[in-house]
Structure formats: structure tokens, C-alpha cells
Amino acid sequence: MRAIRMLLVSALTLGSVTAYAGEQDVQRLTQLLEKSQTIEANFSQLTLGADGTSLQETSGKMTVKRPGLFYWHTDAPQEQVVVSDGKNVTLWDPDLEQATIKKLDVRLNQTPALLLSGDVSKISQSFDIASKEQGEVMDFTLKPKTKDTLFDSLRVSFRKGLINDMQLIDSVGQRTNILFNGVKANQAVPDSKFKFDIPKGADVIKE
């Protein structure tokens, strides 16, 4: 009986420690994300199949601004521009001369870019969060709490308090790694940066 009681006490104690650690992880991640009201950076993106085969490699520049504004420009030869004005997202494909416009999904588990530019005050409602610190690098692993999501796992890494890289893993094991460099935080960025003017004569698709 005493052994059972000891196990119960241990389990309760461990449960309390885990919950506390989880709350700390949420607070640390929220503080790091909210610390940067604007971010400008270059990025390189690599997508790997479940077997490790390279599927796509791109690079470009991005700018984000809270709340909900972002601009991602992927360079040629696979050039595309994705812009959010906080209400709608416009995807511009210059090769097709086509713009696709859809309403911004403000759910963090549907639009990962909003981790860097959206409202993260309730991030724990969408994800279970764990952290790991190694020197000047802080890693956070986010697991969606629902199945209605674009990815199974998301890792966000910070170096010296600034975003360093992100990794998304989807349901079939495909991994997308995004490395940021030349990161500048809290610079003055006008809202006009997030207004995309569709070229005349382009095809426009509204979803």
C-alpha cells in the first residue's frame, strides 16, 4: 500500500512539474515572438521527402509586421510573391501572370507565417509546446492540438533572441526547412509594403 501511495505521489509531483515546465515554455516562446514587432530577413528554404530526397530548394526575402502582415518573395526560377494585408492573402505567380486572392486564415495551425506576425497571445490553445536550450540557441517544438492542420510538427529556433530557422513536418513525413539570415527586428516598415498591386491584364482568382 505504501508503495502505491509513493507511486501516486510521484505521479502527481511529476505531473505538476510537467505542467509548470509547459507554462514556462509557452511564456518564453510568446515573449520571444512578441519581442519582434517587425522582422526583415533573407531566407533559404529546402523541402525534403520522407526518404530524405531533396524535392525543392528556394530562396528569397521576407518582411513581417504585427498584426497579421507579411510579405514573402521567392526568387526566380520559382518566383512567387505572397502578401498579407491582415485581411486577405494574395499569391502572385509571375510566370502564369496570375494572382490568387483568399481570406487570411488567422489560425496559427493553418498559417505558420502568423507565428512571426500574428496574435500569439493564445498560442497554447493551438499547440503543445516544449523547449530546449543549447548555448545561445533556443528551440521550441510545437505540436498541433487538433488534426485539422497543415502540419504534424513545427520547430521554431531562435539565436540570441532573433528568429533563426523553422522546420515543418507534414502528415506524410515531408519536411520543409526555412533558414533565416541577415535578420533585422523592429525596424520601421510602412504598411504600404503589404499592399500588392496586381499588374494590368493579369488573371485574378478569388477563393
From Swiss-Prot:
Disulfide bonds: none annotated. Pfam families: LolA. GO terms for biological process: lipoprotein localization to outer membrane; lipoprotein transport. Keywords: Chaperone, Periplasm, Protein transport, Signal, Transport. Residues 1-21 form the signal peptide. Coiled coil: none annotated. It is found in: Periplasm. GO terms for cellular component: outer membrane-bounded periplasmic space. Participates in the translocation of lipoproteins from the inner membrane to the outer membrane. Only forms a complex with a lipoprotein if the residue after the N-terminal Cys is not an aspartate (The Asp acts as a targeting signal to indicate that the lipoprotein should stay in the inner membrane). NCBIfam families: lolA (TIGR00547). Monomer. Belongs to the LolA family. This is Outer-membrane lipoprotein carrier protein.
